[in-house]
Amino acid sequence: QIVYQRVTNTMKLYAKQRRLTSLITAQINEKEKNSEMLIHILSHIVEFRNGESGSHVLHIHKLTEMLLERLAQKTEKYHLDGDTRAMIALASSLHDIGKIGVDEKILNKPGKLTKEEFEIMKTHTVIGAEMLEQLGIYQNEPLVKIAHQICRWHHERYDGKGYPDGLVGDEIPISAQVVSVADVYDA
């Protein structure tokens, strides 16, 4: 009788544990989906203000995924596991978030920008990075750290001729290097 009761209790506990695990997994998936949705909404707001179609962010996201996948196949130098690749791809959607702080006349100007206007346009990298630095308690979250790298340094160039900091080679985080390639390709 005691053994029977213990087996029954163990089976009930196991079933309850499986239900709880299933609930927690569903909640985690919902949280991840909502986070991804908010990032895409925010990036589309910036694109809308910038007069773009909304496809640039999607292209950057997909190109970043593809480039990271290939890079991970070619080298282990950057430790690009699946979760890291997914996080970089998601953060890539925020690469131009700093454009929200650039004057609309410059953002939407038809034709070539003047030298002064281009200097103002270049500030979007620093503006985006500063916006992310001001997120308080979220500042140290891995996604925010990667988004910060991408925002600030996605216009850096391997030869040091990029902006805003003139970083050279592997001084540029791999997240920003990959998004830079995707951004130039989709320009």
List PLM regions with ranges.
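Short, charged amphipathic alpha-helical "coupling" segments at sensory-output junctions
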Residues: 22-37
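Histidine- and acidic-residue-rich, metal-dependent catalytic cores
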Residues: 33-187
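N-terminal membrane insertion elements
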Residues: 1-22
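Generic low-complexity, intrinsically disordered sequence content enriched
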Residues: 15-17, 24, 46, 75
